[in-house]
Amino acid sequence: MSEKKGRKEEVITREYTINLHRRLHKCTFKKKAPKAIKEIRKFAEKAMGTKDVRVDVKLNKQIWSKGIRGPPRRIRVRVARKRNDDEDAKEEFFSLVTVAEIPAEGLSGLGTKVIEEED
């Protein structure tokens, strides 16, 4: 029998479009941007299967760019599952969420895209 690597054990990067409008519906105005960050963390945790999710500063700035009440309706993010080099870490992997470049045509029609690592 050949040994197969598990789905959760490989280092991988994917691009997703997250519909924040759907996730923030019926949310109080003054809680929208913090809830958007929490929803992005929840999405990345589910997509990559890691408990340790780190949000990039640029992504945080983009969510908060129009204030606490006006996060973007949709956002294109790049989620990377990386190996944790820290010896005393609880998890073997962590997820890093960054902002992906939005094409000129807009977000419609974009699906999930696997990004090849350039090492």
Curated annotation (Swiss-Prot):
The keyword Lyase does not apply. Keywords: Ribonucleoprotein, Ribosomal protein. It comes from the Eukaryota. Belongs to the eukaryotic ribosomal protein eL31 family. GO terms for molecular function: mRNA binding; structural constituent of ribosome. InterPro entries: Ribosomal_eL31, Ribosomal_eL31_CS, Ribosomal_eL31_dom_sf. Disulfide bonds: none annotated. One of its GO terms (biological process) is translation. This is Large ribosomal subunit protein eL31x. One of its GO terms (cellular component) is plastid. NCBIfam families: PRK01192.1-1 (NF002258).
